[in-house]
């Protein structure tokens, strides 16, 4: 199994530059001369030589030192995997229809991609989940914390405050109905201040900053073990506007996807990636498809596509290893992400939407 460069005891600066240049594993650099590595990565020849020496030495001993590095060769039986699936947690969305088609909510230990045009509700879902992941276990939550990586500047703390207050009020109503001591005690710590204190926000302005933050996450998570959700809101923007080299972009995206899968598995957390839609011309027809190409479509375990039909928002479960394709309506209210009002035209449909053939919808909302 190839060992990733992020697991070597290199300086953070060199580590980030290696990743940004497209070097992912030890095998990628071991055949490169110091002068070539220096030129391609943008480091001094001395740093390049030291890097190669460290990689060679560590490759011989093959003892990963990085927190969160996976242990090669660990095996599971099919029964253990089945039990793991049954015991994994879910982060509820407060839209029961969406939770149902996902099998219970956003699953832990998996990567979920949410695609859609601007204004359809991707960031709203991310902010909702950053609050919902903190719901106490006695209320059906996972009692975790959230990391929010923002590449587009769409995060609105005032909106998070509104969502958090609505969630607190909802749980108080439930506790009032049950009148259970456990519920009352759990709510003592579920305050607005605590909710905001456990959303860790990072603003990344380009792909270098994004890659740096992603590859430093294992160290951060080792010091914040309660994190159960990592969000990258706007995966496409840094790579669509800052990179002209398509082969380099593909390598960087593949490395980022593998890192997020590793984080989800090793730290038993959920990963949310939001992606924009782009126009594809097919047989003289303009179609909306997820950005970053077809190869990126295999990166996430689950793919949701949000879209408009007239003035109604819909979510289509387009890809899932365990659930069938389904489409449901939803709405975004002042209180947050919620079920749509039930009408004859907005009842749940299953397997009815092929998003690859969907023509451009109006980009409404904000």
From Swiss-Prot:
* Major localisation: nucleus
Query: What is the name of the protein in this document?
Result: DNA repair protein RAD51 homolog 3
What task does this protein carry out? Answer: Essential for the homologous recombination (HR) pathway of DNA repair. Involved in the homologous recombination repair (HRR) pathway of double-stranded DNA breaks arising during DNA replication or induced by DNA-damaging agents. Part of the RAD51 paralog protein complexes BCDX2 and CX3 which act at different stages of the BRCA1-BRCA2-dependent HR pathway.
Map out region (Interaction with RAD51B, RAD51D and XRCC3) in residue numbers: 70-127
Q: Where in the cell is it found?
A: Nucleus; Cytoplasm; Cytoplasm, Perinuclear region; Mitochondrion
- One MF term in the entry's GO annotations: crossover junction DNA endonuclease activity
- Similarity field: Belongs to the RecA family. RAD51 subfamily.
| UniProt key word S-adenosyl-L-methionine | no
Self-association or partners: how does it assemble?
Part of the RAD51 paralog protein complexes BCDX2 and CX3; the complexes have a ring-like structure arranged into a flat disc around a central channel. The BCDX2 complex consits of RAD51B, RAD51C, RAD51D and XRCC2; the CX3 complex consists of RAD51C and XRCC3. The BCDX2 subcomplex RAD51B:RAD51C interacts with RAD51. Interacts with SWSAP1; involved in homologous recombination repair. Interacts directly with PALB2 which may serve as a scaffold for a HR complex containing PALB2, BRCA2, RAD51C, RAD51 and XRCC3. Interacts with HELQ.
């Amino acid at each position: 199994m190839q060992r990733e460069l992020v697991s070597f005891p290199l300086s953070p600066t060199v580590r980030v530059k290696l990743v940004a240049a497209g070097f992912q594993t030890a095998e990628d650099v071991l055949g490169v001369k110091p002068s070539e590595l220096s030129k391609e990565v943008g480091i001094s020849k001395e740093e390049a030589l030291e890097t190669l020496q460290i990689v060679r030495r560590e490759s011989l001993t093959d003892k990963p030192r990085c927190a969160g590095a996976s242990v090669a060769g660990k095996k599971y039986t099919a029964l253990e995997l089945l039990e793991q699936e049954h015991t994994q947690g879910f982060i509820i969305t407060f839209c029961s229809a969406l939770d149902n088609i996902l099998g219970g909510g956003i699953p832990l230990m998996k990567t979920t991609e949410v695609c859609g045009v601007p204004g359809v509700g991707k960031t709203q879902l991310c902010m909702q989940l950053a609050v919902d992941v903190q719901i106490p276990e006695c209320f059906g939550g996972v009692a975790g914390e959230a990391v929010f990586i923002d590449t587009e500047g769409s995060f609105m703390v005032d909106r998070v405050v509104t969502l958090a207050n609505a969630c607190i009020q909802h749980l108080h109503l439930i506790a009032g109905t049950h009148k259970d001591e456990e519920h009352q005690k759990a709510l003592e710590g579920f305050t607005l201040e605590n909710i905001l204190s456990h959303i860790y926000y990072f603003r990344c302005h380009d792909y270098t900053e994004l890659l740096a933050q992603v590859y430093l996450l294992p160290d951060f998570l080792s010091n914040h073990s309660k994190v159960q959700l990592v969000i990258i809101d706007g995966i496409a923007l840094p790579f669509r506007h800052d990179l002209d080299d398509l082969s380099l972009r593909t390598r960087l995206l593949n490395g980022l996807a593998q890192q997020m899968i590793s984080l989800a598995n090793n730290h038993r957390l959920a990963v949310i990636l939001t992606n924009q839609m782009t126009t594809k011309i097919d047989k003289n027809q303009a179609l909306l498809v997820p950005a970053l190409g077809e190869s990126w479509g295999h990166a996430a375990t689950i793919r949701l596509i949000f879209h408009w039909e007239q003035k109604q928002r819909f979510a289509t479960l387009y890809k899932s290893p365990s659930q069938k394709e389904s489409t449901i309506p939803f709405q975004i209210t002042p209180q947050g992400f919620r079920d749509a009002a039930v009408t004859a035209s907005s009842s749940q449909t299953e397997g009815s939407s092929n998003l690859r053939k969907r023509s451009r919808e109006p980009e409404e909302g904000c």
